[in-house]
């Protein structure tokens, strides 16, 4: 890969390669599919023409409601080539969740699979509610060099008053580094998702950090088992593989034969959140043990317990942890791949990462406090001049603040969130607690935010509370985090009821309104919800009370 490539468009040199870019493993109903780079480029260009025909151009937004697979990859790349913005959406989102996100981003097109294009599909219903056009990504057999092609077929025109005209098809030379590429949505403490837009430059900074730290080359094969609607799936796994000329193996779902598949497909690395690592360790190994082709395994997205860390270390494969956020581009803090497997390699510690040259890191200690306890209640500890407290001093605990070309410009159309997230000197407040260690390592020690991190899925307590209060028998609700050995954190929900109500009824209500991973794991009936002096529910206190057994 040309390390000076300034845009996320497949280098033209790769168009002539017959080496595989994507492999879709066989399933019970389908055969294995190997897609060379030449074929991937042709598929991408074909879909780019379809997008142009549908009126997609510079700055247009395409909501990609597709599962992991070839269709997702090609629609993503085609949108990038057309200088438009890709907005990946969880394919299992409910109608209400899709409608909320579509209202926030106003997509010019919603892309779905043919099976998802039925009038009853959640994304289609949400698009119809808002008058948005929907296109399904169809596969057609053909003769010649390519055995099949992909095409976007309009299945719902949306608002009848809109009839977009065909647009220019852009070449690679037209694409600019400042073009926006991705729009993703993060959970906010107010409950409403916040829109994050990233440019080519934002993502390329992260990709260069990743490929350099992990020494990823065209010889590598990644096993992509993380969702592509997450930043780590797209920019932390898929794109680093493709832009080094490697091969991404993308299963339709997580196979129980994972380790055998790693051996069969000569996988050299994979990424998983700690929850998924727990599950993978329960899967059977091939007769020869851990596949010999594995160079490293990678983890990120949530905290890793020391027990899991030690169990993964026993596999005998280098374990590389990464840390980043949607707002900062993914995995900007990477454990480097060891030069050797001997004692010269750096000893690993969970939650510690070298600070890259491309990212400026400072710590914001709290006012009137010598240290900050992880997940502590921060009410009233901030002052009006946090910039003066920023420090690079070793050993000082506080909020991690970052600045660099990888950082988003700001939350889209959300000045209030931007005032809260950015300091006057441009540093972004991550909401994570850390400390700078000797040798310029960053150690994570906790979180300021109340966001719940369930196995890498970020959940806003305010969103869960809002949905719970929609039940006509719920008087009040407070959502809080519960520590969990497998997921790291799970969702607790304390409610006060207007009259008799069952926990089963509350969970059924929640399942109707939110995607499954947001349904509370524990629902507790309480006499009163504790609030602080400013009227905010004391979620941290509820977590502490639960830990002490006071909310059983």
UniProtKB/Swiss-Prot annotation:
It is an enzyme of class 6 (ligase). GO terms for biological process: fatty acid metabolic process; fumonisin biosynthetic process. InterPro entries: AMP-bd_C, AMP-bd_C_sf, AMP-dep_synth/lig_dom, ANL_N_sf, Pcs60-like. Keywords: ATP-binding, Ligase, Nucleotide-binding. Pathway: Mycotoxin biosynthesis. Its EC number is 6.2.1.-. Residues 463-536 are annotated as: AMP-binding. PANTHER family: ACYL-COA SYNTHETASE, MEDIUM-CHAIN ACYL-COA LIGASE ACSF2, MITOCHONDRIAL. This is Acyl-CoA synthetase FUM10. It comes from Gibberella moniliformis (strain M3125 / FGSC 7600).
């Amino acid at each position: 890969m040309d390390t000076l490539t300034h845009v996320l468009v497949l280098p033209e040199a790769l168009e002539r390669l017959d080496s595989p870019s994507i492999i879709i493993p066989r399933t019970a109903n389908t055969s294995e599919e190997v897609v060379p780079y030449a074929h991937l480029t042709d598929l991408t260009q074909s879909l780019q023409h379809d997008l142009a025909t549908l009126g997609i151009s510079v700055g247009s937004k395409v909501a990609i409601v597709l599962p992991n697979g070839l269709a997702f990859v090609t629609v993503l790349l085609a949108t990038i080539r057309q200088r438009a913005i890709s907005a990946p959406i969880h394919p299992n989102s409910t109608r209400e969740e899709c409608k909320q996100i579509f209202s926030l981003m106003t997509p010019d097109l919603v892309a779905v699979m043919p099976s998802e294009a039925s009038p009853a599909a959640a994304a289609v219903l949400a698009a119809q509610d808002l008058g948005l056009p929907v296109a399904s990504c169809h596969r057609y057999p053909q003769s010649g060099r390519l055995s099949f092609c992909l095409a976007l077929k309009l299945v719902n025109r949306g608002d009848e008053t809109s009839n977009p005209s065909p647009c220019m098809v852009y070449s690679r030379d037209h694409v600019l580094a400042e073009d926006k590429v991705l729009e993703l949505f993060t959970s906010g403490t107010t409950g409403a998702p916040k829109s994050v837009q990233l440019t080519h430059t934002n993502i390329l900074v992260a990709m260069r950090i990743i490929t350099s730290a992990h020494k990823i080359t065209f010889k590598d094969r990644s096993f992509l088992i993380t969702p592509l609607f997450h930043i780590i799936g797209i920019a932390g796994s898929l794109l680093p593989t493709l832009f080094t000329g490697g091969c991404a193996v993308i299963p339709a779902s997580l196979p129980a034969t994972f380790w055998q598949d790693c051996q069969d497909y000569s996988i050299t690395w994979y990424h998983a959140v700690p929850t998924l690592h727990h599950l993978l360790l329960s899967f059977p190994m091939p007769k020869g043990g851990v596949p010999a082709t594995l160079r490293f395994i990678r983890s990120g997205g949530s905290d890793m317990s020391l027990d899991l860390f030690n169990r993964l270390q026993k596999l005998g494969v280098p374990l590389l942890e990464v840390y980043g956020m949607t707002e900062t581009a993914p995995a900007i803090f990477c454990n480097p791949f060891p030069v050797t497997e001997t004692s010269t390699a750096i000893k690993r510690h969970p939650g510690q990462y070298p600070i890259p040259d491309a990212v400026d890191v400072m710590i914001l200690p709290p006012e009137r406090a010598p240290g900050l306890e992880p997940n502590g209640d921060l009410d009233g500890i901030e002052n009006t001049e946090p910039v003066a407290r920023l420090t690079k001093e070793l050993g000082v605990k506080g909020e991690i603040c970052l600045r660099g070309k990888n950082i988003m410009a700001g939350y889209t159309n959300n000045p209030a969130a931007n005032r809260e997230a950015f300091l006057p000197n441009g540093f972004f407040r991550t909401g994570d607690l850390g400390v700078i260690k000797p040798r310029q390592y960053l150690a994570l020690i906790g979180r300021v935010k109340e966001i719940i991190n369930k196995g890498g899925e970020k959940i806003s307590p305010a969103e869960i509370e809002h949905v719970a209060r929609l039940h006509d028998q719920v008087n009040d609700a407070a959502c809080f985090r519960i520590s969990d050995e497998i997921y790291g954190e799970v969702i607790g929900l304390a409610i006060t009821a207007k009259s008799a109500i069952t926990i089963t009824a509350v969970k059924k209500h929640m399942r109707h309104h939110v995607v499954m991973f947001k349904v509370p794991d524990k629902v507790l009936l309480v006499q009163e919800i504790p609030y602080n002096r400013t009227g905010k529910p004391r979620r941290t206190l509820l977590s502490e009370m639960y830990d002490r057994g006071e909310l059983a």
